[in-house]
Every structure is written in C-alpha cells, then in structure tokens.
Amino acid sequence: MIKHRMGRIFSSLCLGASLLAMMSTAHADGNYVNGVEGIKAASLPPPGVYWRWYNLFYKSTTLKDTSGNKSAADLNLDVFASVNRLIWITDKKFLGADYGMDLIIPLVNTNFKINNTTTDFSTFGVGDVLVEPVVLSWHGQNWDAATALGVYLPTGDYNRFDPSSPGLGQYTMMYTLGGTWYFDKEKTLSASLLSRYEIHGDRNEGDLNKGDDFHFEAGIGKKINDIFEVGIAGYGQWQMTDDSGRDAVNPTVHDRVFGIGPEVLITVPAIKSVVSIRGTSEFGGRDRPEGNMLTITLTKPLQ
C-alpha cells in the first residue's frame, strides 16, 4: 500500500536505464504496512465489535539500492493513509480461542517524485481491501496469543507505470501468528511479538509475480497509570523468495527494512477509546525507500 515496486518501464516514458532501475527499487512487494500495530501488536480485545482507525504519515528522501547503499536518486516520497478497520470478536470458541473476523479498508494518498527529473506522480484512492474471515485469540493469566488468515483483494487502482498507484494489482494471502507476555500480575509490563507471512499472486498487468514477504512487529510497554502506557515498538520485513516473470527487475534481490521508535497509549474514558501515537525511523533498508513514519490510531468499542 505505502510502497510497491514497479515492473519494467517502457521506453515510451522517455527514461534512461539507470532511472528505470531507481524507480523499480522505489517500490516493494507487500500489501501489509510495517509497524502499524505497536507495543501490543499480538493482543486482541475480548468479544465485541470494535472500530480501529489508523492514520499513517510516511516520508522518505532516501532510496536504498540492491546492495543497501544510498541510491543517487533524489527521492521525495510522501504517503498519507487513513485506514478503517472493523473487528468483530464473537462469543464463539474454537480450539479454546475466541473466534473473530475483521475487514480493513484503506484510503491512500501518495506523492512520488524524483527531483531533477520529469518523474512526478500523485494519486489518491481506495487501496487494496483486507478480509480476514478467521481470527483466533487466546487470553491466559499472563499472556495473550493470536493467529489469523486473510486475503488482500485487488480493489485499489493499479497502473504498473505509476508508482503512486493505491493498489498492487494482486491477490495476497496473509498468515498471522503472535503473542504477548506480561511480566507481572497487574499486567503493567509487557513484551509482544507478531509475525506475518504474505504469499502474492500474479499482477493483473504485465508478467510479474512478487516474492513472498515475512514481517514482524515487536514492542515493550510499561503501563504508568490508568491513562498512560509508554514503550518502544519496532518492526522488520524481508522478502523471502525471488520475483518471477518477464517484468521482474533484479528478481534475485530480496528487499528488506527495519524500523524502531517510541509509542504512547492514551486511554480516553470520556469517549471509551484508546489512542496510540507512534513514531518510527527506518534503517537497514535494501532495494526500497527508507524513511520515517508517524502513526496515530484510535480504537473504540461499538458494542
């Protein structure tokens, strides 16, 4: 959504071979956006209906090449995403877990520019919708665990010649597994780890199938009082398998990135909601942009 690599750009765009390589590097494979869940990424709420509203601001002026070095491209990438998620945790049990499901609908605005060139794209639209019909969550005395199975649908507009496209033009299966551990009975100190694995289908334009992606999100949190919780959140992402198809660029190069930053959770009793504010800075990037992201999330029970 925030980032996805283009395929091969035709000569009709009047770009040289070196610029083609830069633009292909500027997009990565996966639908899932790194680092959006935070310090309790693997904890799900008790049975009920919930609305979660993510607002993401991503800025990058650094493009990493296939060796992880800073590219000569003078990148200017700005992305804003407003994402609505509806979560339903039922009172039904399966394998001892609460059974639930969720639906995620993103709105994305992307401005992609390489300075000192004619490469300048800007698009706003609905991104690829995620449907997770299977969400299982367990809650122990000092732990939480969760697993899920979902599919991204190619609902967002996709143009392989436009790196600002809000969609990826592919179906993606996503598997999720994670857990949270609480170090005290009062659950004031926690550590959480959430992993996701994406398997991508063929792009609906051109001849391209992106390699699988592995993501993890981790966090350590400390509850200060009934209002505030603070912590450190981080994430990582690796491409696990090669790209394939005639339009694959550097198919054996696997992109990656890591990020880390502070987070604060604020409980707002007046509106029965929790607000999280998180800032992350990326490092260790390869074959993709490397930037900074601010995420503001509102979670509110509807039932």
Range-by-range predicted roles:
Residues A41-G48, T90-G100, W138-A145, F183-L189, ...:
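Short loop/turn motifs that connect adjacent beta-strands in outer-membrane beta-barrel proteins
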Residues P47, N76-N84, D120-L130, G167-M173, ...:
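Residues that define the transmembrane beta-barrel architecture of outer-membrane proteins
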Residues W53, N84-W88, V131-L136, L149-V151, ...:
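Residues on the lipid-exposed face of transmembrane beta-strands in outer-membrane beta-barrel proteins
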Residues A146-A148, D157-S244, R278:
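Detector for outer-membrane/organellar transmembrane beta-barrel domains
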